[in-house]
Amino acid sequence: MSDFTIASTNHTSFTVSDLDRSLAYFCDVLGFELLNRSPRDPAFIERVVAIPGADIEVAYVQAPGHRLELIQYRAPDGRRQVDSRPCDAGFAHVAFDVDDIDAAIAASKSAGVLPLGPPQDLDRGPNKGGRVVYTRDADGITIEFIQPPKQR
């Protein structure tokens, strides 16, 4: 056992290529609340992320039960987009419970966030009886929507 305790989850972070576009999706489409948007001191960020010349703008958005950090790097040059698949080591995604998965898919499509396939019925696990779909945005960020089973 460690000599420290994890007190809570602070946030999940995604690096994005266009902070305005990502904020429009998370706030205007998904209904997140913008908590803060601001640049960070480049010297500080360079020390934190160990990338010489790093320069970023950060936004925090809040949904019920979870906060996201969205980071747009303005420097250094030569940045690239990750193209990982769910089967690749290091792949990450975030999952949100929704009350209507079809409406979530339609709203996401209107913002260019597309499903990887049709929603699927869950026949096992903690969400058995619900429905699930993976979506992907223009930056390759995967967002999973889960419609929990109806309460009887």
Residue ranges and their predicted role:
Residues 8, 55, 90, 129:
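Exposed loop/turn and edge beta-strand positions of beta-sandwich/beta-sheet ligand-binding modules
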